[in-house]
Structure formats: structure tokens, C-alpha cells
Amino acid sequence: MVLLPEKEKRKKEGKKVHILKKFIPYYSPYKVVFFLDLICAAVISLIDLAYPQILRTMTKTIFAGSSSVILKALLPIGVALLVMYIIQGLCKYYVSYQGHMMGANMERDMRQQLFDHYEKLSFSYYDQNNSGQMMSKLVSDLFDISEMAHHGPENLFISLIKIIGSFVFLFMINRKLAVPLLVLVFFMILFSYGQNRKMQATFLDNRQKIGDINSSLQDTLAGIRVVQSFANEEIERKKFKHSNHNFLVSKDANYHCMGTFMSGNLFFQGLMYLVTLVFGGFLIAKGQMEVADLAMYALYIGIFISPIQILVELTEMMQKGLSGFRRFLAVVETEPDIVDQKDAKPLEQVQGTVDYENVSFHYSDDDTLVLSDVSFRIEAGKSVALVGPSGSGKTTICSLLPRFYDVTGGRILIDGKDIRSLTLESLRNRIGLVQQDVYLFCGSIRENIAYGKPD
């Protein structure tokens, strides 16, 4: 294990806080639902905390009285408890329904934002990134983010109320027994924190590996005709097997961390029951604790352990969600290479004269010039054919005109106007283009033919 310097640790923690700050604004359109969800979660937790205390009070007062006193008190107590649990049931319905819908709405908003941003990104981004990875971010990552958006704050809030509330009652019942339990909780938190950091790295690797599987699958299925025509099924099978195996290895590391985390927490929970029983029995023997109080202690330990188990599951969910959100941010914070200039104007009243003046170009990941100091003019209304061997730059020349890429030297003019001074939408609307690799969208033949001009 490599120990990170303290400065590096602080840097990583700062990144986590920075990511959470970027995530919080997505709650803004649903803040009313969010706060009502937390209020309902608080009511559910407080009612769970109240029942053992009500039972303890009744055991020491009403149930210690005569049978007539007990019978007289049963009806109002029963009605009060019924009302209490009806309220709890309604709150649970709101949390389960509206809380989940809040997460689903946030998932929809983020998916739309990601899709819209994909459409703005330049060709250079798609040259360097695989569509399978992009699909993984649109589907798998956003589902994990949605689960975190709903369950994260809600479960954390419920757990904190139950943990703090149960410990308050444990101290009220018997302070001596509460102290060793508090020490156990301290060590449990230290253990959980250490394991949590290890799990985060494995979840991020999982996201990457499932993206690799999607990439391999998408490549093979999209090009299945080419694969079969060259009888390359075995080659593609080996490529997919490699990606599939890497995902299994990543999952193995992930499940190892999870197993250590969950088994360790379960062990600490068992120790809490052990301490309660043994030390509680000792206090009863010394006359420092009542038997009824030990029973209440066991109930509150159960209430205390329940949110710890939720927090254990929440840790896994949060790690998946944060890993997915990092990948989401990596895309939406990527700026397109080709954008409108601030003073860009629409292309209007086109005659159609095209000038390439001393145009040079190389791709962003390679300094080798594809075009070098190319100049020519195409008069309006003329038809021109570019003829040359494969790789001579014919497609590149065509791709520069609608600004799929920007020239690295020289300039391109339409009717004397530099195409960089024009808005992208108006420029591309004036250009008809047939790609080398024809792609058919889902829909009718008519819709595909009219794709460039649906009206």
C-alpha cells in the first residue's frame, strides 16, 4: 500500500468537495420536493425513535399499576399509536414516490444536458472517443447518479437522526453502558473511512471497464457486415473476451473491498450487542441498571445498527454515483473546438464563390500536415471534382468548408467572407454533404432523404 503525502490527501478531499458543489445545483428545480422529502424522512426516523421510549415509560408507570389503570389507558394509547403510524406510512409513501421521482427528473435533466452537449462537440472529440463509452455515460452512469441524488441525502439524513437520537436515549438510560459503545463506534468510523477510500478507486475503474465492454460491443454490432464479410468473428470474439475479462478482474477488486467493508462493519455491530449484553449484565448484577432498561438498550441498539447498515449500502451507492458524476463532468466541461465567434454573423444572400487561401491543416493529435499551403477558387455555379490517391486530403478539404475542423493556417472564404466570421448554423445549413460512410437513421426512407431539410 502506498501512503499519500498529507498535501496529496488534502488535494483529493478538496476535489471531492468541489464535485459535490457542482452536483448540488441540480437539486434547484426540485428544492420543494427535496425539503419535503427530508422532512418526511425526519418524521419517519423520529417515530421509530419514539416507540422504545414510549414502551419504557409505559412499563415503568402504567403497566406497573393496577389492571383497571392499564385497561383504561390502552384505548387512548392505541389510538395515539395508530395515528402516529398512519402519519409515518404517509411520509414513507411520499419518500418512496416523490423522492424517487425527484431522482428520475434529475436523471432526465442531466441526460438531456449530456445529449445536447454531445451534439455541440466537434469532430475532433469523436475522433478521440468511442461511442460505446459515450453510451455508457448516457445510460449506466446517469442511473447511478439518479440513485445517489435520491437516496444519498435522504438516507444520510435518516441515519444521522437515528444514530444521534438513539445515542441520546442510550445516554439517558445508562451513561456507563453508553461510553464503551461510543468507543466502538469511533473505531468503526475509522475502519469505514479507510475502506471507503479504497472502494472509490474500484468503482471508478468499474465504470471505465463497463464502458470498454460497451465500446467493443458497439463496434462489433455496428460493423457486423464487415466483420462477417472478412470472416473476422474470431478476432472480434477475442477482443470482446479481453474487455469482458478485464471487467471481471475489476469487479473482483471491487467486491473484495466491499466484502472487507461490510464484514468489518458487521463484526463491529456484533461487538456492540456483545458489550451491551455482558457489560449490561454486569451493571444489573451491581444494581446499577434495571432489567427493563437493558431491554430498551437492546431496542435502541437495533435502531442504531439499522442506519449503520443503510450507511454501508449508501457508501457503495455514493461511490458509484460520484464516479459516474465525474465521468459526466468530464464530458460537459469539455469545450467544443469549433464555436461561433462573439461577433459572428449569419450567412445570407449566398452567391457561392469559394476561396481556399494558403490553407494548411493537421489533426489535433498529429502534427503531420495533411494540407500545406493549398490555394484555389471555385466560382459560383461551377462543378468541381477533386481527384487524387487515398489519403491525399480530398475529404479533409471538404470537411474544412462546413468547419467540421478549423484550418491551422490560411483561411477559407465564401463570397469574400471568412467562414470563421459566420455562425455555424447558418454556414452548415447552406452546405449539402454526402459522407463517404452513409448512415441511415431509424425511420422511413423519406425521413432519411429529407433529413437535411425536414420541411
Give the label of every model feature segment.
Residues 19, 27, 95, 99-103, ...:
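Juxtamembrane loop-to-helix connectors within ABC transporter transmembrane domains
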Residues 32, 123-124, 140-149, 153, ...:
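An intracellular "coupling" helix at the cytosolic face of ABC transporter transmembrane type-1 domains
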Residues 34-91, 171-176, 287-291, 445:
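Transmembrane helix-loop-helix hairpins at lipid-water interfaces of multipass membrane proteins
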Residues 52, 56, 87, 153-196, ...:
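A hydrophobic transmembrane-helix motif
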Residues 209, 232, 256, 304-331:
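Cytosolic ends of transmembrane helices, especially the final helix of ABC transmembrane type-1 domains
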Residues 340-341, 347-455:
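ABC-type nucleotide-binding domain
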